[in-house]
A protein has these predicted regions:
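Glycan-recognition and catalytic cores of secretory/periplasmic carbohydrate-active enzymes
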Residues: 1-176
Length: 176
């Protein structure tokens, strides 16, 4: 994987010539896998590859308002899987970059405001002139459930940790 990282920090979808694009969720998968590999193998010399990849991700896959882009070089389509994977990746790599804190919240808020129907389900894709509102359980709903649960768990852990640090006890926030 390291040998296939581009000089700008990105990774192509695949090694074949017809796979020469860079997309949000596959980049997120790669970043998460690299993060885990570094942590489980203690190959800390690969942290520079992770940081370079994460910087590319942060700089190229998001608009200022938190809109997650499908491809690094264009806005549309905006796909719910990109929204979900963005949240998951930014939460997981929270310790790598402080920028992730604000960005994950922006992405989550943008997604809830722009990709969620008033009935609660999430849209499949927003294109330039229309929105595909088909309900796909695996592609849309399941991934957003995973993303939102991941975000909520990270916020709960953060709140518990900061409460413990400030007060000196971990039982301040009780779930009962």
């Amino acid at each position: 994987m390291i040998d296939h990282q581009n000089p700008d920090g990105s990774w192509y979808y695949g090694t074949q010539t017809h796979h020469r694009w860079v997309d949000n969720f596959h980049t997120g998968f790669v970043l998460e896998c690299l993060f885990d590999y570094i942590n489980f193998s203690s190959k800390f010399e690969l942290r520079s590859n992770l940081k370079k990849g994460l910087e590319f991700y942060q700089d190229n896959f998001f608009l200022a308002d938190g809109t997650p882009k499908y491809y690094h070089d264009r806005i549309y389509p905006i796909d719910i899987h990109s929204c979900a994977q963005s949240i998951i990746t930014l939460v997981k790599l929270d310790s790598v970059s402080e920028q992730n804190q604000e960005l994950k919240d922006k992405v989550a808020l943008w997604t809830l405001e722009n990709m969620q129907d008033s009935d609660g389900y999430f849209y499949f894709q927003k294109k330039r002139f229309f929105t595909n509102k088909i309900v796909y359980m695996r592609w849309s709903q399941a991934w957003m459930l995973k993303a939102l649960v991941t975000l909520l768990i990270s916020q709960k852990e953060f709140t518990e940790k900061t409460s413990k640090d400030r007060v000196g006890t971990s039982h301040i926030l009780s779930t009962s």
